[in-house]
Amino acid sequence: MLGKEIGKDQRQKRIQDIILRESVSTQAELVKLLAKEGVQVTQATVSRDINELRLVRVPIGKGRHRYALAQYGGDSDIEEQLARLFQSFVQDVDRGENILVIRTADGHASGVALLLDRWKRDDIVGTLAGEDTIMVVARSTHDGESLMEEFNALMLG
């Protein structure tokens, strides 16, 4: 079957549909599943789509993970999800004045950062996530201290 030329929005919608119905652990698997639907795409493009869609990797047991759409049901739900993610994937939190650096397991920074952004806290100016590191900018040094305490509490449960 020849690959279809589809736009970015359609491709990302297909990715979301696949993630909802299949257990996809890797970008390579997602490329293959898209190809089965006639959508030819590179792994680099899938990687960008995953980041733009802010897909999260969730544990499915025995050290395995799968991609999932982030679900939100309000602030308390976000706090519960943050606690689970911090306990499962955050390895360290450090602070310098009003900037905090959160180190996560590989591939989990964007999922944690997304929830921090959705938390809509006045004391958080914004976040920037890489593959395994998140920079959180607090509004003030005092806010940075408070956030450091909260993040450490989230890690401990």
Curated annotation (Swiss-Prot):
It holds the Pfam family Arg_repressor_C. It is found in: Cytoplasm. One of its GO terms (biological process) is L-arginine biosynthetic process. Its main location: cytoplasm. Gene3D superfamilies: 3.30.1360.40, Winged helix-like DNA-binding domain superfamily/Winged helix DNA-binding domain (1.10.10.10). GO terms for cellular component: cytoplasm; transcription regulator complex. Pathway: Amino-acid biosynthesis; L-arginine biosynthesis [regulation]. It comes from the Bacteria. Disulfide bonds: none annotated. Regulates arginine biosynthesis genes. Belongs to the ArgR family. This is Arginine repressor. It comes from Deinococcus radiodurans (strain ATCC 13939 / DSM 20539 / JCM 16871 / CCUG 27074 / LMG 4051 / NBRC 15346 / NCIMB 9279 / VKM B-1422 / R1).
